[in-house]
Amino acid sequence: MRRRLPIVAALLCGLALLVPSTASASPTTHSRTDAAAGWLARQLVDGERFEAVFGGVAYPDQGLTADAVFAFSAARTADAFADRAITWLARPEITTGYVGSGGESYAGPHAKLLLAALVKDKDPTSFGGVDLEAGLLALLTPSGRFSDQSAYGDYSNAFTQSLALLALDRTATGAPTAAVDFLVGTQCADGGFPLTFGATPCVSDVDSTAMVTQALQATGRHTDAQEGLTWLVSVQNANGGFGVGSAAPNANSTGLAGEALFAGGRFTAAFKARGFLKSLQVDCSGAPADRGAVAYQASGFDPATATRATAQAVLGLSGVGLAHLDGGGDDEDPVLACS
């Protein structure tokens, strides 16, 4: 009988390996922010990246992956996924494929990766073999604009300029005054900010104004930022949402505007924006795999747009601005509690 005990023990151990472990299951949460971040984490390819598919071919989507890093940092959850994402972004071929190489150099990607690296406490002077800070500063023109160096044209805009200021403000040298002045100088007469520089007439844009006001708040230009926030509040829909022009409100614009309003102390409007984002979120009546995701618009969940919508919605749900993102938090990918 005693000789059989090791055999029985071995069989029991083997069976234990076949039983699913509940320890690795995603925890449940009642937090809408955490549920959105958890859903976003589970959409990552191999738990580390996003891809864009064109013509049946998958290409790396560094921009959306960086957005996910920002979302996880804002929610203070899914940090293990943020760690894997930043490691993927720091692969040399992924970094240079985004910021440019061989004479091509892009302001927006440099700024976005620099911000992501700093949020995750990585060395930006050697990220994927690239000095992101030096590379970005090399794109600063005499006017104060950070411009692309490319044979395909200059696609820098209010987004890229704002990201540059937000990223450089975290560095030892800070954001160049000329770059801040340039951005302030693009303000439209109504107080908002346009996406495209130098366009006539000057047309204020929700997404751009949300980004610019955060950059100006971070760099000490509070009066100009507050003027932009006043314009944002003036174009907020009654349901709390924000849209592009006269289009219906959407999660992306509302997420960006919401975080800007929180950062600027416009709490009444910010909470209205958060309420709209919650109304777009898949709740317990939805398919289990979709719960926590944020739909792009009120028309409902669409997997083609939900990933990017959720990434930016998390910013508005959390109320944490880009200037205050900090890596860390819980490692898990929580699911919405429905019991």
Positions of predicted regions on the chain:
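An alpha-helical repeat/solenoid feature that recognizes helix-turn-helix modules
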Residues: 26-33, 50-81, 98-129, 146-178, ...
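Secretory targeting and sorting signals
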Residues: 1-25
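Buried hydrophobic core positions in alpha-solenoid tandem helical repeats
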Residues: 40, 89-90, 136, 183, ...
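Primary recognition of N-terminal secretory signal peptides and signal-anchoring hydrophobic helices
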Residues: 29-46
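Intrinsically disordered, low-complexity N-terminal segments that are enriched in acidic
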Residues: 88, 92-100
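N-terminal low-complexity, Pro/Thr-rich disordered segments
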Residues: 20-29, 328-339
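Short, charged, amphipathic alpha-helices and their helix-cap/turn boundaries
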Residues: 129-142, 177-187, 227-234
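Alpha-helical repeat scaffolds
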Residues: 82-91, 126-137, 271
